[in-house]
Amino acid sequence: MKIKSFIYLIFAIPAFNLFCQAPELLWTKSLGGSESEVGFDVIGTADGGFLTVGYSSSTDGDIEFNAGGIDMFIVKFSSSNEVMFSKTFGGSDDDQSLSAVEAYNGGFIVGGWSTTSDGIIPGNYGLSDAIVLKTDVFGNLEWIKNYGGSNIDGIRSIIRTDDTSYLFTGTSHSNDIDITDHIGPEDKSDIIVGKIDLSGNLVWLNSYGSVGDDYSNQIIKTKDSCYLICGYRKLDFEDYYILKINGDGDLIWEKTFGGSAEDVAYGIDELSSGNIIVCGVSLSEDGDVGYVSGIADNWVILLDSAGNLLWERSYG
């Protein structure tokens, strides 16, 4: 029987050989069963190990339990690359984890989405809810919370804040219950950002976007204690969509970049200079995109702290 598994690859890149040879493969490890296991996020942990999150649909092999559909799948590795725990969480429908961070009070915070309203899932407001769960250091569930409305909602990225809270970003079609400021029509998605306290209680939740579809992929904290979110906006075509908010969720600025085809931002970071680097994929050959060598290229843009474009490069 074919096994579809998480696969872990670790590379060593000696600085003095950076341009001389391919990275050296140190080790690989796979975990899974006879169905599908997929990883979406990996974080380093304070003990020198790391944690991965994704989903599992297996009931055999390395997977001890499946509640139904796909379950959240969380694996903790030690500093010596040994599995410390492997856990699945969910109900009778689909549950998926997409992002994780170490908790302030020990253990781990994991965000994702769920279409389940039974098992360990505390009800479901609509078609899918944004989900955050907290485990202890051994992977035992401490609490799980759902957020959203009566339509489709989910979390894509979650981080820690400066005031021992957590901030998540994701996508929503809802305009009720926790989400009451939907911007576009019901069939269009907004970016959402929510703040929760140490116990998962919702502090605030805001929507950002346009009359089209808006999606987020990553959120980061900036040196001035604000937050940057990257993703894409789809009106006629997808464009990079970058926005900056303050600690209360107020919009500081928002920018779009791209051309007349699909351009989607997946990663964002703030440099020591205060400039902002964004990367993703571009299929455009016009507008802000100077050159594409193939059907799709890795498109990197550099912005100043106010979101103005400084330069762009395509690689591929």
What are these regions (language model features)?
Residues M1-E24:
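Bacterial Sec-dependent N-terminal signal peptides
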Residues F19-G316:
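A sequence-level/structural motif corresponding to short, flexible coil/turn segments enriched
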